[in-house]
């Protein structure tokens, strides 16, 4: 697991200039468990409260969804929240556009014709760029410690320039 690897890497004197870790850095609790060595780790970012999208179902902005989650659970937002919400958005949209919800072919036709603006951005299964695949925007981020807490900061948005950058990429500390 990442905490064990990162701890042992430090013990061995391994000090790379940059480290990118995917799924293991989704949650602030994992980064917190790394202590000071978590500062500066990078990861791809799928969704944050700063993304410019809104729910086609509820009209909520990304920030409003994250705030509602934090208020209801007393826990910080995490990237999967946007996708969990989008899952329901898209499912409801598909049902709205299905001619006969009891007919699998009708449901499939509604899915493959989906072109929906969701809280994670456009969900489009109409065949572009690849049939039955919908790509959502990814940006690069970095965990940066501020005021004693780790924050996931968008540091690069070249592949999705409509998503605002929140800070510069800093060297590992």
Which stretches of residues belong to each language-model region?
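Extracellular/periplasmic ligand-binding modules, especially the Venus flytrap/periplasmic-binding
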Residues: 1-9, 50-113
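Extracellular/periplasmic bilobed ligand-binding domains
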Residues: 1-49
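Acidic/polar loop patches that form or flank catalytic/metal-binding clefts of enzymes
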Residues: 16-20, 102-105, 118-120
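Intrinsically disordered, low-complexity boundary segments flanking structured domains
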Residues: 27-34, 110, 125-129
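Short, surface-exposed amphipathic charged segments that create phosphate/polyanion-binding patches used
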Residues: 33-35, 56-61, 139
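Short acidic (Asp/Glu) and glycine-rich catalytic loops that position anionic groups and cofactors
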Residues: 45-46, 88-89, 117
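A short acidic, often aromatic-flanked loop/helix-cap motif at beta-alpha or helix-coil junctions
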Residues: 48-52, 161-162
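Solvent-exposed, acidic/polar segments of extracytosolic/periplasmic ligand-binding ectodomains
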Residues: 112-173
